[in-house]
Design a protein with these regions (language model features):
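Catalytic center-proximal scaffold of phosphoryl-transfer enzymes
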Residues: 1-269
Length: 269
């Protein structure tokens, strides 16, 4: 059994969707994409995402999807090589990634603080970050042969992982709403993992889907800076009266008005 977590929505209104599936098949990804109106899917290097996006693009030529990969996963291969072999080449790759992430964070902070426009943000990425990636690519090609000759399997694996996915690791630069990694989605997994240590089981597929429903509400509320307890209370109070699509939209975390809790009745001794 698998819990799939999808993060999406607008920058200011993120949504965390939890989905229960019996398998890890790439067909599940196609189900998640059904009705998707976005332009890019960002994921780790799992091949199921590759096949799903390829299938989607073959069958939706009018709505092609770009596919971006996570640079943290790529960096992790080099970090693992450092731990396993102490490879100097892998250490150098980790340093290059730190340079990329540092530059990205500085630009993202300026953009989030509205000190630069979206146009300037994308332009500065091309000026500050893209050249580092280009040097990194040349460096990887140079080191690829050396790593193979030295039979540094961990380092060679890390280099090949990056080169194989190079376009998908760097195309995020063209989208202001994308970061170099999938950390935000990865962080959304942690609350479920921690909670599962307490409740242990969902009992059935229906129970697991109910768990997904509640986690979607709670974690989306938290992602939008809403107290989840207050949000759920107001949601459950107002949902029975929702009749139109507009009514339901007004119950989304970024639209709902959280009314103060009022105690009804009195305690009787």
């Amino acid at each position: 059994c698998y819990m799939w977590v999808v993060r999406g929505g607008e920058d200011m209104h993120p949504v965390h969707l939890y989905n229960f599936k019996w398998t890890r098949s790439g067909k599940n990804v196609l189900e998640f994409l059904d009705g998707f109106e976005g332009c890019v899917l960002q994921s780790d290097g799992y091949s199921g995402y590759d096949s799903a996006v390829d299938f989607w693009n073959e069958n939706h030529p009018e709505h092609m999807l770009a596919h971006s990969n996570c640079n943290i996963h790529a960096r992790r291969y080099f970090a693992d090589a450092v731990k396993a072999t102490g490879s100097k080449t892998a250490k150098e790759a980790v340093k290059i990634y730190e340079e990329i992430f540092t530059a990205e964070n500085k630009l993202r902070n300026l953009f989030n603080d509205k000190k630069i426009s979206e146009t300037d943000f994308l332009r500065l990425r091309q000026e500050k970050v893209k050249p580092v990636f280009e040097k990194f690519h040349s460096w990887l090609l140079e080191k690829q042969q050396t790593a193979a000759i030295l039979n540094s399997s961990k380092t060679a694996e890390a280099i090949n992982y990056c080169l194989k996915r190079w376009d998908k690791l760097t195309n995020y630069l063209d989208y202001s709403f994308l970061t170099p990694d999938t950390n935000a989605a990865e962080r959304a997994v942690k609350p479920f993992v921690m909670a599962r240590k307490n409740f242990l089981f969902s009992g059935s597929g229906i129970g697991a889907r109910s768990t997904c429903f509640i986690f979607t509400l709670i974690e989306t509320a938290k992602a939008n800076s809403k107290n989840p307890e207050d949000y759920l209370r107001c949601l459950f109070e107002k949902a029975p009266y929702a009749q139109t699509d507009e009514d339901w939209k007004n119950l989304l975390p970024w639209n709902i008005e959280l009314t103060p809790f009022k105690m009804r009745g009195e305690w009787v001794e």
